[in-house]
Amino acid sequence: MVNYPHHFIRKQSKPSQISKTINFANRGMSFEAAINATNNYYLSQKIAVIHKKPTPIQIVRVDYPRRSRAKIVEAYFRQASTTDYSGVYKGYYIDFEAKETRHKTSIPMKNFHAHQIKHMSQVLDQKGICFVLLHFSTLRETYLLPASHLIHFYRIDNGGKSMPLDYIKKNGYQVNVSAFPQVPYLDIIDKNILGGD
């Protein structure tokens, strides 16, 4: 014990319990930022080259309040975007979408659009690896769902229903988040899609 001046006794605080589950919200990080960090890790370790696709935007009007400051006031999407991420892993083309929800029992299919479903189907037709990463923020659970199962569910009623978590658990794979990489989805690709260890 350390004796402080004026007989001040420092109270020993008990170490707090550390949650085993990483919560992106508690760390000030969005699900998308965690995926981007994962992709940066994969790139730096020469495991895969996967990037977020830029969204093409048409700038219509810009205000210049000062010469050095331009402010975009009006802009539109040039075309409907396909999926969020694409790249190459072990010679395979990878293409995936990432969605986050606060719902506990399902994910709304309105989050997926017909042009995205069509794009995913085209990727699968070319033997690419296509999937969605689904993060249930309230439950702190993340799943990888192969695109074939998303497409099948979407076509039941043209994306009008919500996809139950039970369907995702039955047809997908839980991603166990970690420190490095944060969202290790390639582990699931290796084990369950490519058939490796």
UniProtKB/Swiss-Prot annotation:
Any idea what this protein is called? Holliday junction resolvase RecU
Q: What family does the entry list?
A: Belongs to the RecU family.
**Which cofactor is essential here?**
Mg(2+)
InterPro entries with a match to the protein in the record: Resolv_RecU, Restrct_endonuc-II-like, tRNA_endonuc-like_dom_sf
Q: What is its EC number?
A: 3.1.21.10
Gene Ontology MF: a single term: nucleic acid binding
Q: Which SUPFAM superfamilies would you find in this protein's record?
A: Restriction endonuclease-like
Cofactor note as given = Binds 1 Mg(2+) ion per subunit.
CDD domains per the record? RecU-like
Q: Indicate where this protein is primarily found.
A: cytoplasm
| UniProt keyword Hydrolase, yes or no | yes
